[in-house]
Amino acid sequence: SKYFAGYFNLSTLLSMSTSAYDGFYNLLSPSEKQLLLDNIRNIGNKFYNEYVNHLENRIADNHVWQMTFRILTMAAFATVGEIPEASVWADYCYNEWISRLPGLNKDGAWHNGDSYFHVNIRTLIEVPAFFSRISGFNFFADPWYNNNALYVIYQQPPFSKSGGHGNSHEGQRTPNGGRVGYADALAHRSE
């Protein structure tokens, strides 16, 4: 549909379909399951086909990491064994994560700005938490995460304005709930 143009809209549809399929699995009729699986397959294939041999060759493709990659990862693992391509997506997402993220450095900073850091915080917690859980390896042991706690504090200390690095971030007068929640989640993962 022309009304669902754009990757953020498609990723929202993929997320909703995956959440409904996974969360209501025992309540869905076979036709409802198939409808959701068809939607997951169509959007998942679209993302995968655009990422493979592209994403791994680009040093910065910021919109992918904000949400579409995370959502494809969750869709892949939720449908392994249900959609033939899902195991390929899962393998790709896992290997892409371990080869590229969380950062392209060890200092813990998000060099393209704090606003962009903020739109990535769900991915930066949810994907490594998921991979840590299924693999038994602590993905938060990466040097980037160890130093990221300092970045979160130094970029915007408690009760202060933001350092202003990033689109519109100079207007952040106090750390918002997302930043505080991220810091809390990071602290619990780094224990």
Predicted regions and their residues:
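Acidic/histidine-rich catalytic neighborhood
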Residues: N147-E191
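Aromatic-lined, polymer-binding surfaces characteristic
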Residues: S1-K161
